Structure formats: structure tokens, C-alpha cells
């Protein structure tokens, strides 16, 4: 009678220190992979939250156009917007013909100075040229236009400068060439970003044009 040969018993693997370390490494790798996948999935799901938002500006309400005659200055008069306030220059109390046109809602003002002409008109024109040249260092561009009003003997130049950091985006001078010389300049009480302030600058430009067109000597 033949007997079936018995299979030899295979010894069970003994869990040694090396096997335990390998198992721990495998579990760590699996856990790390799960964490990475979860982080990627969360990042993709919230991707829209990290997109940069478009730049915006505060809305600026512009007042209605209306003007009144300013006739309290000794040497000249003009029409001024009703939303503005004309005040004497606080830093030059002895100069009765120096005024500020204050625009508090825009945090700006137009400074107007007056000088008498006694054969020295070229000196005043040179001063204007020097001041404009200083501002040009921060300007991207400059444009100017002649002012000619033969009826009221008002002649001059209007100067406009573009660019961030320009201290005065608009200035002008007026003269009758024999007795009077007036210079005006727009300033803001903060460092303006002229790009974002462009609607206000354009609005004030219209008021300066009106001031020049209604300017008269006394």
C-alpha cells in the first residue's frame, strides 16, 4: 500500500526588527501620499479664492456746475464754482491779491498769486519756466495752450502735466503785459495717483477753463 508523501511544513516567517521597520515605512509613505492628495484636492477646490481681485476705485460724486462772480479782490475778478470757497492766502497776509480757491470735497485747492509788472515781465516768465521744469522730472508728459483774450487784455499760458507723483497737474499764468501778472496752480493735500484722480482732474479742468474765460482786470 502506497502512502501519500506528506508535504514538508514551511516554517512561518518570523517578524524580525527589519520587517517591522519596513512595515512602518510603508505605512508612513501611504499616509504621506494620502495627505498630499488631500491637500491638492483642497487647493484645486479653493483655487478661485486665491485669484487676485481687479483693482477698483472709490466712487467720487461730482457736484453740479454752477458759478458765482468773485469781485472782492483788488486787482482782478473771475467766476468761481459755487462748491468752492475763496479765502485769503494764510501764509501771505500782506499780499491782498493772493487767494486760495479751496475745494474740500476733493482735498485740493487752486493757489493764485499776483505780482505787479514794472518792466520785469520776463523775470516772472522765467520763474514760471523754472517751476514747470522742476515738476517735469516726475511727469510722463506735458501739454500747453495759449490764452488770448483781446477784449479784456488777458494773455497767458495754460500748462497740464500727466504722471503719478506730479505735485501740480495743472497751472497757468495770466498777464496784461504792462501792469499785472497772475499765476495759478492746482494742488492736492495728499500725494495723488493722477490715474485714479483723473475724473476729478478733468472736472476741475473745466472750472479752471471757466475761471480763465471770465477773468478780468480792474
Enumerate the predicted regions with their spans:
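Signature of long, low-cysteine stretches enriched in small and polar/charged residues
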Residues: 126-183
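Short, flexible beta-strand-to-coil junctions
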Residues: 3, 104-106, 115-117, 162-165, ...
Amino acid at each position: 500500500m502506497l502512502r501519500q508523501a506528506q508535504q514538508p511544513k514551511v516554517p512561518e516567517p518570523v517578524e524580525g526588527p527589519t520587517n517591522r521597520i519596513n512595515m512602518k515605512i510603508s505605512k508612513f509613505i501611504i499616509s504621506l501620499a494620502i495627505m498630499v492628495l488631500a491637500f491638492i484636492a483642497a487647493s484645486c477646490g479653493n483655487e478661485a479664492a486665491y485669484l487676485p481681485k481687479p483693482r477698483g476705485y472709490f466712487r467720487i460724486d461730482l457736484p453740479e456746475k454752477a458759478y458765482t462772480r468773485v469781485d472782492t479782490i483788488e486787482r482782478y475778478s473771475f467766476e468761481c464754482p459755487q462748491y468752492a470757497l475763496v479765502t485769503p492766502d494764510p501764509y501771505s497776509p500782506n499780499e491782498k491779491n493772493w487767494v486760495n480757491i479751496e475745494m474740500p470735497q476733493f482735498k485740493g485747492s487752486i493757489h493764485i498769486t499776483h505780482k505787479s509788472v514794472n518792466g520785469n515781465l520776463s523775470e516772472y516768465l522765467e520763474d514760471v519756466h523754472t517751476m514747470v521744469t522742476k515738476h517735469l522730472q516726475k511727469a510722463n508728459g506735458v501739454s500747453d495752450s495759449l490764452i488770448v483774450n483781446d477784449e479784456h487784455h488777458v494773455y497767458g499760458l495754460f500748462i497740464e502735466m500727466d504722471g503719478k507723483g506730479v505735485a501740480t497737474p495743472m497751472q497757468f499764468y495770466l498777464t496784461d503785459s504792462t501792469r499785472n501778472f497772475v499765476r495759478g496752480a492746482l494742488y492736492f493735500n495728499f500725494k495723488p495717483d493722477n490715474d485714479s484722480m483723473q475724473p476729478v482732474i478733468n472736472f476741475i479742468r473745466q472750472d479752471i477753463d471757466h475761471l480763465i474765460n471770465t477773468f478780468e482786470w480792474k
